Amino acid sequence: MLSRAACSTSRRLVPALSVLGSRQKHSLPDLPYDYGALEPHINAQIMQLHHSKHHAAYVNNLNVAEEKYREALEKGDVTAQIALQPALKFNGGGHINHSIFWTNLSPNGGGEPQGELLEAIKRDFGSFAKFKEKLTAVSVGVQGSGWGWLGFNKEQGRLQIAACSNQDPLQGTTGLIPLLGIDVWEHAYYLQYKNVRPDYLKAIWNVINWENVTARYTACSK
């Protein structure tokens, strides 16, 4: 089960500016399954490149950007601090998003959630089928690169679907707490599904880890 700390993923992965000087470097998280475990829905080549190359690049570039930011803070160089914001957002978002994404998937996934999450989905979207249709449509409809998300609106106490461009993190962009993210960057599917994003969306539902999504919902909805 996830702790309530799961509600603050971005705060946990991107350290406060006040502790940048003593921070530990970010590292690439291990996958909770083998690269080929999600086949035939997502093949091993995609998973290996996606995790060991793309996510690793976000981690490395985030560490570089944070080190440069620390130096700019020490020098009082506000211009440099401002110039580094896009790199921090892009690479920090990439690290946050993918760290959630890997745990949202499972070789034993698919089907429907149970319990409180399923009831919340029915309450906020009418039915699981309608929810699935809406999140699929939002994800397919992302122009260029980005993510489709199921998030929790803490203030309103309800689930919401949203899209984020590029690697913009859901919580930092919309305030929604991320529960389920679907990566629709081409690197997530092109080697297997070419330019047919809807086929990738149809396949990914077979490996959604509803236990993980439910744990995130439980941690954030109390």
Curated annotation (Swiss-Prot):
Cofactor: Mn(2+)
Compartment annotation: Mitochondrion matrix
Keywords assigned by UniProt, alphabetized: Acetylation, Manganese, Metal-binding, Mitochondrion, Nitration, Oxidoreductase, Transit peptide, Ubl conjugation
Residues recorded as bearing 3'-nitrotyrosine in the entry: 58
PTM annotation, UniProt: Nitrated under oxidative stress. Nitration coupled with oxidation inhibits the catalytic activity.
GO CC annotations, alphabetized: mitochondrial matrix; mitochondrion
Range of the transit peptide: 1-24
Enzyme superclass (EC): oxidoreductase
A molecular function (GO) term: manganese ion binding
Modification N6-succinyllysine occurs at: 68, 75, 122, 130
GO biological process, alphabetically ordered: cellular response to oxidative stress; regulation of transcription by RNA polymerase II; superoxide metabolic process
Catalytic reactions of this protein: 2 superoxide + 2 H(+) = H2O2 + O2
Cofactor binding comment, as recorded: Binds 1 Mn(2+) ion per subunit.
Known EC number: 1.15.1.1
Binding site for Mn(2+): 50, 98, 183, 187
Residue positions where N6-acetyllysine is found in the record: 68, 75, 122, 130, 202
InterPro entries xref list: Fe/Mn_Superoxide_Dismutase, Mn/Fe_SOD, Mn/Fe_SOD_BS, Mn/Fe_SOD_C, Mn/Fe_SOD_N, Mn/Fe_SOD_N_sf, SOD_C_sf
Function comment: Destroys superoxide anion radicals which are normally produced within the cells and which are toxic to biological systems.
Quaternary state and interactors: Homotetramer.
The family this protein is said to belong to: Belongs to the iron/manganese superoxide dismutase family.
UniProt protein name: Superoxide dismutase [Mn], mitochondrial
Natural source organism: Bos taurus
